[in-house]
Each structure stands twice: as C-alpha cells, then as structure tokens.
Amino acid sequence: MKRSAINDILGHTRQFFSQHDVHLPPFASFSPAQWQQLDTAAWEEVFDLKLGWDVTAFGRNNFAAHGLTLFTLRNGSAKGMPYVKCYAEKIMHVRDAQVTPMHFHWRKREDIINRGGGNLIVELWNADSNEQTADSDITVVIDGCRQKHTAGSQLRLSPGESICLPPGLYHSFWAEAGFGDVLVGEVSSVNDDDHDNHFLQPLDRYNLIDEDEPAQLVLCNEYRQFR
C-alpha cells in the first residue's frame, strides 16, 4: 500500500468516526514527530499490545474490496502478564461492500457489534479437523438469543445488533453493498493478531508500505521505530 493511500484512509475514517460521535484517546492523533518526543518507557503498553491504528488490505492490492480500518482501544497480554487485562476492545470502519476475509481465532471469543451506519453481513462456517469449512450447522448467539443456522449462512446485523463468535468459528464480514459504511465495535477476550488468527486462504495480516509521502499518523505495527 502507498503511504499516501493510508493517510487518505485514516483521514476518511477519522471523519467517519466523528460523524458517529466516536471519540478516541489523545494518542490517536500523535504524529510520528510527536511520538519521537515522548518518554517511550511510559508508553510500553501501547507498543507491546499494539494499541492504536491498524490499516490493512490483508496483503492484497485492492483495499476497497478487501480491507479494514480499526483502532484498538484496550488489550491485555496473551499469557496474562505483564498486562493483566483479560479483555480487548476495538472500533472499526468497514466501508461499503468491503470484505474482511474468512478466518477464525484459536482462543479469542468476540462480540461483533453494529454501532451505526449501514448493515453488516457476517458469513459463518464451522471449522473441521483439517481447518477447512465444515458442512455442519452453526450455532451463534445474537443479542442474547441462541440461534442455529445452516453452514455458510450470511446473517445481517442492523445498527444496534451484535453477534457473539466463539473460538474456532470461521467468519467473514462486510458492509452490505448500497447501504453505506458501517461503524463496528468489537468486545473480546485478549487480542493477539500475531498468533491467534487463522485465515482460510493464507494471507498477510499487514501490508508492506511504499513510502511515497510522509506518514501523518503511526500504525500499530510501526511502533518499533520509537523503541
């Protein structure tokens, strides 16, 4: 991805969040120069847990079709130490018709919440013993209501609705085409993007970046430059 595209994406997402009255912590606005001036030891939790901005096209070259913009607000250590929080929270911007590819988590249990905008479509499959999609019915809980659906069902979440996804359940999601972008919340157990994501089709979690212009903000996988 080009840095200029990432700058534009983040600018658009910040506007979208503002339209939905979403307020982020101050470090969401820190430029690279501001990060350079900080006492990095005081910010180790942000660095270690990859709090902050994340822009990905999942290693592909078409962000509009396959991509996601998110901000991790809080998280804990995967093994419980040194950061003892047992929960995580993200806020996400899913653009109209933009797909997050099919994947599951080995350990993370998460609630995906449509906080506003258009409709969110979630496609669900059980994983078989070979980590492929299974033909068995899936069972999920939507806003406290336990439901059974056929394999590969695509469930529509309108604003205000949420779904609980257990570990090992394949899921892909996108904003329903023609209904606009979606503000998505995620509340979960500890998030570990380095070790707890399994994609049905192997892909890269982060994109290589072509530095065609200066970065306006810092992504969560770029903090190493400040340590």
From Swiss-Prot:
Signal peptide: none annotated. Changing residue 90 to A: Retains 0.7% of wild-type activity. Pfam families: Lyx_isomer. It catalyses: D-lyxose = D-xylulose; D-mannose = D-fructose. It is an enzyme of class 5 (isomerase). Its cofactor is Mn(2+). D-fructose binds at residues 90, 103-110, 171, 186, 193. Transmembrane segments: none annotated. Gene3D superfamilies: Jelly Rolls (2.60.120.10). Sugar isomerase that catalyzes the reversible isomerization of D-lyxose to D-xylulose, and D-mannose to D-fructose. Shows similar activity toward D-lyxose and D-mannose with a turnover and catalytic efficiency for D-lyxose as a substrate only 1.1- and 1.3-fold higher than those for D-mannose, respectively. Shows weaker activity with L-gulose, D-talose, L-ribose and L-allose. Overexpression enables cell growth on the rare pentose D-lyxose as the sole carbon source. Homodimer; disulfide-linked. Dimerization is facilitated through a disulfide bond between the two monomers of the dimeric enzyme. Belongs to the D-lyxose ketol-isomerase family. This is D-lyxose/D-mannose isomerase.
